[in-house]
UniProtKB/Swiss-Prot annotation:
It comes from Thunnus obesus (Bigeye tuna). Pathway: Energy metabolism; oxidative phosphorylation. Component of the cytochrome c oxidase, the last enzyme in the mitochondrial electron transport chain which drives oxidative phosphorylation. The respiratory chain contains 3 multisubunit complexes succinate dehydrogenase (complex II, CII), ubiquinol-cytochrome c oxidoreductase (cytochrome b-c1 complex, complex III, CIII) and cytochrome c oxidase (complex IV, CIV), that cooperate to transfer electrons derived from NADH and succinate to molecular oxygen, creating an electrochemical gradient over the inner membrane that drives transmembrane transport and the ATP synthase. It is an enzyme of class 7 (translocase). This is Cytochrome c oxidase subunit 7B-liver, mitochondrial.
Length: 20
């Protein structure tokens, strides 16, 4: 991932949805 913002949402967002 190039952008930190996108990585944050892509990784964090998915983690929250999966792991909560």
């Amino acid at each position: 991932s190039n952008t930190s913002h996108q990585d944050f949402h892509s990784f964090y967002g998915t983690n929250l949805m999966i792991g909560g």
